Regions:
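Active-site mouth of glycoside hydrolases
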Residues: 1-100, 224
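Short secondary-structure boundary/capping segments
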Residues: 4, 66-69, 104-108, 149-153, ...
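A generic secondary-structure signal
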Residues: 38-42, 78-79, 209-216, 332
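Substrate-binding clefts and catalytic carboxylate motifs of secreted carbohydrate-active enzymes
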Residues: 52, 81, 90, 118-318
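Short glycine-/acidic-enriched loop or helix-start segments at secondary-structure transitions
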Residues: 63-64, 101, 145, 236
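An acidic-aromatic loop/edge-strand motif
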Residues: 76, 247, 345
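C-terminal cap/loop subdomain of S1 sulfatases and analogous C-terminal strand-loop tails that border
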Residues: 96-126
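Terminal connector regions
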Residues: 285, 295, 307-309, 322-346
Length: 346
């Protein structure tokens, strides 16, 4: 309440892939009613509370988000109307016709997913072309810091490993192995420190693009909620942006930038272009309320050796609380010794 943070409060039900359908057994409903009434009376006086939900990822028999047709959810909706009528209630999250982003227009209401980088190309078309109204859970996995890896394992590793090849690694991050992803994107990494840097860069890239894409649909997309900020277990790799021992990953800083009140963004659909290819990408500046006026917007294309291959600075008038299209980033992809360039926006 004091910090002004909005709270989405779910009743204590979650599928997590097990028992997806909310129970309608009479004894369970009796216990759930008692728990829900207590929760409503305790929490309804908090000004930070904005919405109630029946629970996390609750499904029907067809694996679609549960609706008020379920007796369990209908009972909770009635209790909210009776005890906290000023607040919104949703049956579950995700809610609506689809649980995940749909390619069919108009069906992505409150959606979840995904939690891993979808690959060069698909990551950007999947998240960049959605029409979701609310993206209430998504993530991207990345390795923990070197300090956390060394502290978690009895012997500090010098080389990365696949989770499936090492029981201890698997115990600390089975779902979140990024080994093949990094090998595909960057080639083989022998050194654990380099591997961690690559893994954290990919996590940061994946999350930043999703956040910027959703914000470029301002007034059509109402929010983005990352899974997750921190974690209750010392994983070697996970979707958290702050690891178990409190070390910020690169994604922490890139997501912070993406939420900045004044933020330039580039809209693209892949990370690789052949040398000599003409590249033309939309450039937008995202603004919060209260931020408006003329601003200098600059971009540059540089090599890792510091060479500048293209650049431009322009003055643009920025409207407040808006997606300000300020032109394009247009250049011919240069031939570089290492095949890499950096596009910088300011």
């Amino acid at each position: 309440d004091e910090l002004g943070l909005l709270v989405w409060q779910e009743f204590i039900q979650s599928s997590s892939g097990v028992d997806n359908i909310p129970s309608e057994l009479p004894h369970f409903l009796t216990l759930l009613r008692q728990s829900a009434v207590h929760a409503l009376k305790v929490k309804r006086n908090h000004t930070s509370l904005v919405i109630w939900s029946g629970g996390n990822e609750l499904m029907d028999e067809n694996r679609k988000p549960v609706t008020l047709e379920n007796k369990n959810i209908a009972m909770l909706a009635d209790l909210v109307r009776m005890l906290d009528p000023a607040r919104m209630f949703v049956p579950t999250s995700p809610s609506g016709p689809e649980a995940h982003i749909s390619r069919t227009p108009g069906r992505s209401h409150d959606v979840h997913g995904w939690w891993q980088y979808q690959g060069n190309g698909r990551q950007y078309s999947y998240f960049g072309d959605t029409d979701s109204l609310l993206h209430s859970e998504f993530g991207c996995d990345g390795m923990s810091s070197m300090q956390t890896v060394a502290r978690t394992l009895s012997k500090c590793p010098t080389k990365p490993e696949r989770m499936k090849d090492n029981d201890l690694w698997r115990f600390h991050g089975d779902w979140w192995c990024t080994y093949d992803r990094e090998e595909t994107m960057f080639g083989h990494a022998e050194d654990i420190r380099r591997y961690i840097r690559l893994s954290q860069w990919m996590q940061a890239e994946g999350l930043r693009f999703i956040l910027e894409s959703n914000q470029r649909r301002k007034w059509h997309n109402s929010g983005s909620i990352i899974w997750q900020l921190s974690e209750p277990w010392p994983n070697l790799s996970c979707t958290s942006i702050v690891d178990y021992y409190g070390h910020e990953k690169q994604a922490y800083y890139w997501t912070k930038d993406a939420f900045a009140p004044l933020h330039p963004t580039l809209d693209y659909r892949r990370l690789d272009y052949a040398a000599g290819t003409a590249v033309e990408l939309p450039l937008t500046v995202l603004t919060d309320s209260g931020i408006a006026g003329d601003a200098e917007v600059a971009w540059s294309v540089r090599g890792l050796d510091g060479a500048t291959y293209a650049k431009e600075t322009r003055t643009a008038h920025l409207a407040a609380a808006a997606v300000n299209r300020v032109g394009d980033v247009a250049f011919v992809m240069p031939q570089t010794a290492d095949g890499l360039v950096l596009v910088r926006l300011t």
